[in-house]
Amino acid sequence: MESMTPISCPTTPRWNQDRPFLTGRFHQETRASSKFADSKRFTLDSSSSGVEQAIGCYDTPVQELIVIDDLLSALVGIEGRYISIKRFHGKEDSIAFQVDPSMDLALQELAKRIFPLCEYYLLIDQFVESSSQFKNGLVNHAFAAALRALLLDYQAMVAQLEHQFRLGRLSIQGLWFYCQPMMGSMRALAAVIQQASTKQFVGSGVLNLLQSQAKAMAGDNSVRSLLEKMTECASNAYLSILERWVYEGIIDDPYGEFFIAENRSLKKESLSQDSTAKYWSQRYSLKDTIPGFLANIAATILTTGKYLNVMRECGHNVQVPISERSKLTIFGSNHHYLECIKAAHEFASIELVNLIKDKYDLVGRLRSIKHYLLLDQGDFLVHFMDIAREELNKKVHEISVEKLQSLLDLALRTTAAAADPRHEDLTCCVDRASLLTTLGMHKDTDSNSIEDPMSITGLETFSLSYKVQWPLSIVISKKALSKYQLIFRFLFHCKHVERQLCGAWQIHQGIRSMNSKGTAILRSSLLCRSMLKFISSLLHYLTFEVLEPNWHVMHDRLQSTRSVDEVIQHHDFFLDKCLRGCLLLLPDVLKKMEKLKSVCLQYAAATQWLISSSIDINSQSHPQKTMIRDTTVTESIFNFEREFNSELQSLGPVLSKGSQAEPYLTHLSQWILGVSKE
């Protein structure tokens, strides 16, 4: 059963229900409340000597005249002298006509053939009255109006038959003859009405019921045509709502009958705060019951109005031009209404895409995000990491985000990024968990990989964010930005590891003049070079094998898109592919990479001590102490080398195994294996 959305609607006046003379119920109720209440005696003339006579007391020709007179009344729902209405309480709309059992059997049989038509009329008439109340919705109002027009024709036919009867030209066989053509149509309408009343159908439910009944009557052209006419009349009000939606983007639905629901609690501002991007998918949504003739195009109708609404909220009040609008009708040649809806959808799609691309420069905004969050232009980041080193080395709970923001602004203003007017939309943030922990909220990861929160520094949790205004937030939503941030955090930490190893390499280069052949310094230098080659290979893979190619694919696709949904689809596909290509959706590979980076950082931090110890060893004159200390330094370097090579070699099989399902890992595997063979 379809229920209407609880929307305030006008109340039917009490006097319209309490006064039967306004509805015609007095014809049916006055006699039922008097002498026909319990047991009824049939009389011919109430002014006779008080003796009530049954119809069987009269001759057959007289009985026929009396029966015809009563049948003409029964055809419009009024009891006669010898024909009464029996109502069965407990069964909704259950009524039956009865005759005086003393009536001639032939006349009884003919009368009973006409009784169904009388019952159908009563049922339809009651439905017309009840459905005309405000609460039943526009579709029921329109359906009731069409039925009322049909009943007027029916009543005109009864009036003509009565005229013939008064002229003495109508027999009971003639009455049956004239009633037969209406029997099938009234039966079909009564069946529809009974089902609609029982299940309390409104809106789409009524239209679907009418259409299904029309299809079921395919063998009876006249009945099918009538039901199709009723469907067309009932759908006019519904199509008026549809027209405003696809042509103006407005839901003018006072009784909640339309198949598109609006969630007013969701605001456009939520796109920059809600990580699930509910606004675009749930602000307007499809209800369960959709008219059958619109089922295949319901999604198109939904997006058409959504596009027009987005433009309206941008202050760009665009409507489908009057010259391009056509009256939507269900029945017609070649389903003209489908062509109208598709034309309106194409217009709204192109207008919104052009608005976002041209006025709001979507591609330029995406390119700006690529510069900063995907490190396409990293000069500002180098400067920032230099001036923010002290703050980033603090524990997470000790970091001042305000200070980091000031340092970020300084780095942006003093580098090439200052020429970009969008750099002011860049902000910094510090997460409370490591990258593995953050990803663990979405993916199953080993609990051993989750680090102690107290040991995490800003270097593992620092990230950038980007202010995105409406309507670009439809495409670059909070959910999309969170994906950018995951990629940025991984790249940022890789850059940090590379900088630390470069510092260690510079220390080694500073002592090249020393004779280090066969010493721990030489071994340390080779290890540093291998580590630097590893992290450089990883960054090269991330940048040139993953981010750049996927960016160009997305950029090319955006040039030919014709709807915002396609734009969102291409952008989300780009981000998901980058996340997977950057190993962030592959826990086994990512944990190996994090372990290797951790070893590199530990080695880089120990380099100063290792080098200074090696220099001191060469300058000392006590052989025994020199040997012990040299052994300690050499053993430390061996431990770093052994751990690094072990992790690197174990990464190879993981990448080879993963490359069967993820072919792009083959490129990374080639780089990594190249490092391990050196």
Swiss-Prot record:
Protein's GO biological process: gametophyte development; gamma-tubulin complex localization; microtubule nucleation; positive regulation of microtubule nucleation
Impact after mutating G305R: In spr3; right-handed helical growth due to anisotropic cell expansion and abnormal microtubule branching characterized by wider and divergently distributed nucleating angles. Impaired interaction with GCP3
Residue ranges of the region described as Triggers nucleus envelope localization: 63-116, 118-180, 290-318, 472-548, 587-622
Disrupted-gene phenotype: Embryonic lethality. Impaired development of male and female gametophytes.
Annotated InterPro entries: GCP, GCP_C, GCP_C_sf, GCP_N
Function according to Swiss-Prot or TrEMBL: Gamma-tubulin complex is necessary for microtubule nucleation at the microtubule organizing centers (MTOCs). Required for the positioning of the gamma-tubulin-containing complex on pre-existing microtubules and for the proper organization of cortical arrays.
Lineage of producing organism: Eukaryota, Viridiplantae, Streptophyta, Embryophyta, Tracheophyta
Organism, as annotated: Arabidopsis thaliana (Mouse-ear cress)
Subunit text: Part of the gamma-tubulin complex. Gamma-tubulin complex is composed of gamma-tubulin and GCP proteins (e.g. GCP2 and GCP3). Interacts directly with GCP3.
Subcellular location: Cytoplasm, Cytoskeleton, Microtubule organizing center; Nucleus envelope; Cytoplasm; Cytoplasm, Cell cortex
Signal peptide residue numbers: none
Family listed: Belongs to the TUBGCP family.
Name of the molecule in the record: Gamma-tubulin complex component 2
Domain of life: Eukaryota
Pfam families to which the protein is assigned, alphabetical: GCP_C_terminal (PF04130), GCP_N_terminal (PF17681)
GO molecular function: gamma-tubulin binding
Keywords per UniProt: Cytoplasm, Cytoskeleton, Developmental protein, Microtubule, Nucleus
